[in-house]
Design a protein with these regions (language model features):
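N-terminal core-entry segment
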Residues: 1-136, 176
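Terminal-appendage/accessory-domain detector
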Residues: 81-94, 101-215
Length: 215
């Protein structure tokens, strides 16, 4: 469609603002950890809606349709049973795109979680507070929940100069969800990424957890 670089960047911001805000509302409403595939449906619908020039009613339609069809993607199932399902991102994007196309075709949707009164505060900051500014690139190629002990091991090795062979035991103190990450020797890349013992061991031996350590 001849989208300019400025319009592309603006649309990217729209995607993140919609995804994060809808994600916060959805997470609170259902009281269990959803994954990024769920929120990606909102972000994709909002982004495509902007590129297609949707008005307010059309955008609300697309977001409602996206919510009704978004993947459930329970986070802890990915943690307990690592596989290529991971966070359901591909189908979240597909649902968001289909929601925009359905809106163009005349399908309607009414209401979505972010519109509920208890989440009004998430809408009131639109245009003044940007959630995209709270994002970053993950430094290690594994679940974010394992990053704190990885960083701690790397920093300690730099500070005290010990060799991997000097380490006999490692005790990790972390939050409950992170303790449910796998602690076995992985046989697949997915098992290596949804793990806590393996990445920590890699950080001690290699000083990093990148692509070579999880393949």
């Amino acid at each position: 469609q001849g989208v300019t670089y400025k319009e592309y960047l603006t649309t990217l911001v729209v995607c993140y603002e919609a995804a994060v805000r809808c994600g916060l509302a959805t997470q609170d409403f259902y009281k269990f950890l959803h994954s990024t595939g769920t929120y990606g449906a909102f972000g994709t619908a909002a982004g495509m809606g902007r590129l297609l020039g949707f008005n307010k009613e059309q955008l609300n339609n697309a977001l409602s349709i996206a919510e009704f069809h978004a993947p459930i993607t329970p986070v802890m199932r990915s943690v307990h049973y690592p596989s290529m399902n991971k966070d359901g991102v591909p189908f979240g994007v597909l649902v968001g795109a289909e929601a925009a196309l359905e809106t163009l075709a005349g399908s309607t949707g009414r209401g979505y979680t972010l519109e509920l009164p208890e989440y009004r505060h998430l809408l009131e900051t639109l245009g003044s507070t940007y959630e995209i500014m709270n994002l970053y690139f993950k430094p290690y190629t594994c679940c974010r929940w394992a990053h704190q002990p990885i960083t701690a091991c790397i920093d300690l090795a730099k500070e005290y100069g010990y060799a991997p062979t000097d380490v006999k035991h490692v005790y990790v103190h972390t939050f409950d969800s992170a303790t449910q990450l796998s602690k076995i020797v992985p046989h697949t890349a997915d098992e290596a990424q949804y793990n806590i013992a393996w990445p920590v061991a890699c950080s001690i031996v290699h000083g990093d957890v990148g692509l070579p350590q999880v393949l």
